[in-house]
Amino acid sequence: MAVNTYSMKKDWNKKVSAHFSVYEFACSDHSDTVLIDTELIYILEQVRAHFGKPVHINSGYRSPSYNISIGGSPRSQHCLGTAADVTIKGVDPIRIALYLASMPYFQKRGGIGYY
């Protein structure tokens, strides 16, 4: 696992994979720093390929102060750049969660929630 650090000022439109850019993972508090895990990007690309539709990132990286302000867990993986809340238009969240749960990565570690 490698977590890369990006700057919204310098890297906002930088592609981190074929279908994702830095700005999609940016914190809602408009902070400059964005942390993104390379494994997370790989997983999101697999999800996109599986469902054949774009993946929308509702929440990616969260600065610690923003995470506190929204009542997030003090140990939130979002603050480490290793988590994302996503939706796919026309796909029930439970289907996304079940697909993720079937991946070897999540059979070893990690957590999946849906709402």
State the predicted function of each range.
Residues 75, 80-115:
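Catalytic cores and adjacent binding grooves of peptidoglycan-active enzymes
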Residues 29-30, 55-61, 93-100:
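N-terminal start-of-chain detector that recognizes signal peptides
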Residues 36-43, 53, 66, 82, ...:
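Amphipathic alpha-helical interface surfaces
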Residues 1-50:
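Extracytoplasmic cell-surface/polysaccharide-interacting catalytic and binding patches
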Residues 32, 52-53, 72, 88-92:
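Generic structural signal for short, solvent-exposed loop/turn connectors between secondary structure elements
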Residues 41-71:
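Extended, low-complexity, intrinsically disordered C-terminal regulatory tails
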Residues 4, 21, 59, 64, ...:
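Intrinsically disordered, low-complexity segments enriched in small/polar residues
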